[in-house]
């Protein structure tokens, strides 16, 4: 269910502090985060976040099209290897 408009988007406070501290958008510094639930706000455009997917950190460069989405949407947690292999080859 969507979040109420009167509440505004959820962004982890530590993420906001790190983004302000890192020295501006477009800097080479990657901001490491476990907060997949944080909403991408316009101030994050140009930053690169390393979003944890449960196993490793996936680099996500934020563009204008991503505003309003969650950080976790761009770091998939499941890998799909396809369905079972062809059984004819096993005989």
Curated annotation (Swiss-Prot):
Family recorded in the similarity comment: Belongs to the universal ribosomal protein uS19 family.
* UniProt cross-references to PROSITE patterns, sorted A to Z: RIBOSOMAL_S19
Identify the gene encoding this protein.
Answer: rpsS
Q: Which HAMAP family match?
A: Ribosomal_uS19
Identify the species of origin. Syntrophotalea carbinolica (strain DSM 2380 / NBRC 103641 / GraBd1)
Name the InterPro entries on file. Ribosomal_uS19 (IPR002222), Ribosomal_uS19_bac-type (IPR005732), Ribosomal_uS19_CS (IPR020934), Ribosomal_uS19_SF (IPR023575)
Annotated disulfide bonds: none
What name has this protein been given in UniProt? Answer: Small ribosomal subunit protein uS19
Which key words are in the record? Ribonucleoprotein, Ribosomal protein, RNA-binding, rRNA-binding
Where on the tree of life does the source sit, at the highest rank?
A: Bacteria
SUPFAM superfamilies in UniProt: Ribosomal protein S19 (SSF54570)
Pfam families in the cross-refs:
Ribosomal_S19
Q: Which GO terms describe its cellular component?
A: cytoplasm; small ribosomal subunit
Task: Set out the biological process GO terms recorded for this chain's protein.
Answer: ribosomal small subunit assembly; translation
> Per its record, what are the GO molecular function terms?
rRNA binding; structural constituent of ribosome
So what does this one do?
Protein S19 forms a complex with S13 that binds strongly to the 16S ribosomal RNA.
């Amino acid at each position: 269910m969507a979040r109420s408009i009167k509440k505004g988007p959820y962004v982890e406070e530590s993420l906001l502090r790190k983004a302000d501290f890192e020295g501006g958008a477009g800097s080479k510094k990657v901001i490491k985060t476990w907060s997949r639930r944080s909403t991408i706000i316009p101030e994050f455009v140009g930053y690169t976040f390393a979003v944890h997917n449960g196993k490793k950190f996936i680099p996500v460069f934020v563009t204008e099209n991503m505003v309003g989405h969650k950080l976790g949407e761009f770091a998939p947690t499941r890998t799909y290897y396809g369905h079972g292999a062809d059984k004819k080859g096993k005989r």
